[in-house]
């Protein structure tokens, strides 16, 4: 049975909101880009969604305090990587210390010099076409321009603060 609660204290509602979304499994992606100074930036996203097939559009959400935020302007490009369980370490790395995200040999320079993460299920080069700030966050809309498929793998999901793969019903 669902429990319904309305609280006078907004921090309690915030905690209920967070708990509800922890129960919502989401696919895991990594977004990489280049900052205005040419240095790489990236982050893990669980908000990736397709928006349209014609033209091919996708969306993701991000915090405006993200190290990649300065690159989110119309006309700039990003590479969106979809992940499987064997590439879970990329999700963890891109969600951790930003100074270590591009330390190592887990990526190569891709189109326009943007990092392409190795061993992902797919990657898509996209151009930022719209950015919609919402409070301290933003919805970013991109148009897919190119991409490639990697080796098949199951989906990587994030659920209850844990990375996992789907199981059959």
Task: Cite the ranges covered by each PLM segment.
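Basic, polyanion-binding surface patches
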Residues: 1-169
């Amino acid at each position: 049975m669902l429990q319904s609660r309305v609280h006078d204290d907004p921090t309690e509602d915030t905690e209920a909101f967070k708990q509800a979304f922890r129960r919502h499994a989401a696919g895991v992606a990594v977004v990489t880009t280049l900052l205005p100074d040419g240095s790489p930036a990236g982050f893990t996203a669980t908000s990736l969604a397709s928006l349209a097939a014609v033209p091919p559009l996708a969306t993701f959400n991000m915090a405006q305090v993200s190290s990649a935020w300065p690159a989110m302007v119309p006309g700039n490009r990003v590479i969106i990587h979809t992940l499987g369980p064997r590439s879970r370490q990329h999700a963890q790395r891109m969600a951790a210390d930003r100074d270590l995200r591009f330390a190592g040999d887990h990526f190569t320079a891709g189109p326009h010099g943007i990092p392409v993460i190795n061993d992902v299920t797919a990657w898509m080069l996209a151009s930022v076409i719209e950015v919609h700030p919402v409070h301290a966050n933003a919805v970013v809309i991109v148009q897919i321009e190119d991409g490639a498929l990697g080796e098949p793998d199951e989906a990587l999901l994030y659920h209850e603060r844990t990375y996992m793969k789907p199981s059959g019903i």
